[in-house]
């Protein structure tokens, strides 16, 4: 199966040297970093926001740092991120935040997709008002909203960056269960989890794990 995400000889000073990673549709990789700044920098590099010192980041065999602005924008439409910051727009209601990518790219939110979003929120244990501004949400509710927004955009690549680290245990398990359920679908995206330190995710069984706290990274493959 062709690679959807590929990191070739990727070097980011202070984080990793000569990292090689390849993810195909439906596969899951886990990267452990030594700190929050390392996680953020790796995320920015993977999604094309910050060039590495050397090496390449490819999505669908296209090197992100050789693309022009329009080409990069087109590639990013197939990538969804769920981060510790959640990325919700403060002056948009929760539901508007969740549906914004669909409206922006397609101009419509199909009824079936809206129903899927509401069901996901319920499964995650969301108790907030979807018509309130995100400033009223708890941290866990902000992450839930960000996850649902990512899922309903039907990405080909999901990147989870530190979004699970500070969640209360039950919320973490709920979100991880839904992330795993997504990976069990026939059209599952590739998924990259980036976490900090020794956070344990017992429900997650990645195809490959990279511990970037070591140089060279410790690599564990699922057998």
Task: Indicate residue ranges for each PLM-predicted region.
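Conserved ABC transporter NBD signature motif
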Residues: 55-65, 161
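Q-loop/switch helix immediately C-terminal to the Walker
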Residues: 85, 91-104, 116
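Conserved ABC ATPase "signature" region
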Residues: 112-129
């Amino acid at each position: 199966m062709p690679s959807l995400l590929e990191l070739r000889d990727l070097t980011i000073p202070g984080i990793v040297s000569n990292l090689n990673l390849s993810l195909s549709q439906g596969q899951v990789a886990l990267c452990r970093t030594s700190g929050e700044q390392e996680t953020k920098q790796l995320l920015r590099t993977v999604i094309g926001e910050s060039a590495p010192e050397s090496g390449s980041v490819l999505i669908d065999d296209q090197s992100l740092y050789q693309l022009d602005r329009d080409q990069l924008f087109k590639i990013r439409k197939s990538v969804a991120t769920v981060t510790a910051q959640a990325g919700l727009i403060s002056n948009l209601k929760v539901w508007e935040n969740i549906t914004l990518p669909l409206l922006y790219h397609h101009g419509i939110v199909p009824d079936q997709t809206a129903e899927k979003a509401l069901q996901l929120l319920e499964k995650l244990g969301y108790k907030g008002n979807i018509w309130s501004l995100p400033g009223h949400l708890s941290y866990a509710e902000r992450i839930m909203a960000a996850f649902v927004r990512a899922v309903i955009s039907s990405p080909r690549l999901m990147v989870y960056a530190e979004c699970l680290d500070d969640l209360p245990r039950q919320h973490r398990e709920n979100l991880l269960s839904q992330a795993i359920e997504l990976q069990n679908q026939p059209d599952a995206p590739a998924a990259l989890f980036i976490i900090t330190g020794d956070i344990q995710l017992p429900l997650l069984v990645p195809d490959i794990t990279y511990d970037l706290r070591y140089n060279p990274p410790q690599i564990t493959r699922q057998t």
